[in-house]
């Protein structure tokens, strides 16, 4: 049986160090029963590898969790025999994985973009015959992300760091961030009611480190780590899964997040830099 003191959350805000035993206790923007988390996963296993503890922590605080898996898993085969069936296999493994962490099956969503081909789906365009992930006669990552953001209406979004080597991770990061503003604006009304405000966004690490240090540390009981490892083990088709589990175990029952800040351009911010100043004389 876990105790409250088995959980530790530390958030760094400037020179302030906030410590608590819940996510809510270290958050300035917590929206009580309106909280809703959306994890955007370039590939089916990215969220469990980078945020398998956080998914469980959300459940602990009664926050609904939705997982949007961007690609179809078609490039994940490790044998010739699997080439034609790997998407189906990965889909079954994915449901097993995230349902084991308490995510309802209906909250596990597949966008359906072809694995390793996301560069061809940047932006939004009128769908043509062989396009994938068609919504309202349009295709493209920004079309899909805007649609799902408006349908799910999350208060917070989580996505792998932009510093990852995998092009799919980088593309998803970039396309999601601009889609947050699309989803909060009035364009493309056929994709749903605009969001009242832009959700807060956090990066989590999967394979590569953060570009800038994280600001939130989450520490859980060992049982949460064992649940995470068991969920990762659902991806039996992936031959390298044992090495990934070793890495996760060595990291212990801890995960970290980096908050993404949108620093919008404001000319007045630079005005003082260019103002004429009195000459300054220095004495030795």
What spans do the regions from the language model cover?
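Short amphipathic alpha-helical segment that frequently serves as the phosphate-/nucleotide-binding helix
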Residues: 48-52, 91, 173
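Hydrophobic alpha-helical membrane-insertion segments
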Residues: 52-54, 80, 111, 121, ...
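Glycine-rich phosphate-binding loop and adjoining beta1-alpha1-beta2 segment
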Residues: 73-110
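Metal-dependent de-N-acetylase/amidase catalytic core
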Residues: 1-38, 61, 85-86, 99, ...
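Divalent metal-coordination and catalytic microenvironments
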Residues: 45, 71, 94, 108, ...
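A structural preference for short, hydrophobic beta-strand core positions in alpha/beta folds
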Residues: 67, 110-111
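ATP-dependent adenylation/pyrophosphate-handling site
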Residues: 26, 32-85
């Amino acid at each position: 049986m876990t105790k409250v003191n088995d959980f530790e959350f530390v958030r760094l805000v400037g020179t302030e160090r906030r410590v608590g035993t819940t996510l809510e206790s270290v958050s300035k923007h917590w929206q009580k029963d309106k909280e809703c988390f959306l994890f955007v996963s370039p590939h089916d296993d990215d969220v469990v590898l980078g945020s398998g503890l956080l998914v469980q922590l959300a459940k602990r605080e009664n926050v609904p969790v939705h997982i949007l898996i961007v690609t179809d898993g078609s490039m994940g085969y490790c044998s010739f025999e699997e080439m034609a069936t790997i998407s189906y296999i990965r889909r079954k493994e994915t449901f097993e994985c995230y349902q084991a962490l308490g995510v309802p099956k209906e909250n596990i969503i597949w966008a359906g973009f072809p694995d390793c081909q996301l560069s061809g789906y940047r932006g939004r365009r009128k769908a043509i015959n062989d396009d994938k992930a068609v919504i309202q006669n349009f295709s493209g990552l920004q079309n899909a992300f805007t649609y799902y953001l408006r349908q799910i209406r999350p208060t917070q979004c989580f996505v792998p760091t932009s510093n990852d080597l995998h092009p799919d991770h980088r593309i998803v990061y970039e396309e999601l961030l601009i889609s947050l503003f699309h989803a909060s604006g009035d364009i493309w009304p056929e994709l749903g009611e605009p969001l009242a405000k832009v959700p807060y966004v956090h990066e989590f690490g999967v394979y590569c480190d953060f570009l800038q240090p994280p600001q939130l540390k989450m520490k859980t009981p060992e049982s949460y780590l064992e649940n995470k490892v068991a969920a990762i083990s659902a991806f039996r088709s992936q031959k390298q899964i044992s090495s990934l589990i070793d890495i996760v175990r060595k990291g212990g029952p801890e995960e970290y997040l980096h908050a993404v800040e949108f620093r919008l351009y404001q000319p007045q911010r630079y005005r003082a830099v260019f103002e004429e100043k009195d000459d300054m004389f220095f004495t030795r």
